[in-house]
């Protein structure tokens, strides 16, 4: 085993609310097991993290850079995912510091693409199913809410490039530089 891509974790709000304990375990025990496997086989790892480690997006449109920490609600119902992703990054960093494992962190932003499950609580499939069913398109937030979108194929290319870099560049944000106002 030369390469491990660790993406095992629910990503839709409905799933990590329904499966809070499993989400928590995926971000802790699951990460540890992947890193123990990497330690055993001297494998390189790309760990799938998330932009949620930065906390809610500021209203002023501030773009987070990889060196910022962000702020999250440690006790919210989403904390199993949001704080779980921060904790998973800590596990990765500690394994690197203690055991020398070559682990890279990919912080994924809002990703979309083919085969996304419908009725799963993800923004793009929810818009599509609501439009097809003649329902209103519900936007969480107000008319100023903006988001960036990342096509899944571009994300896969980026993660593959991250895996193949000679040196670990540190955590990398995988998202678009283009913000889209959802009211458009």
Please name every model-derived segment.
Residues 1-109:
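N-terminal Rossmann-like NAD(P)+-binding domain of SDR-like oxidoreductases, especially those catalyzing
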Residues 38, 96, 131, 139, ...:
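Hydrophobic pocket-lining residues that define ligand/cofactor binding sites across diverse proteins
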Residues 73, 144-145:
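Catalytic Tyr-x(3-8)-Lys segment
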Residues 58, 86, 111-126, 135, ...:
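Glycine/proline-rich active-site loop of Rossmann-fold NAD(P)-dependent oxidoreductases
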Residues 105, 149, 179:
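Short aromatic/basic micro-patch
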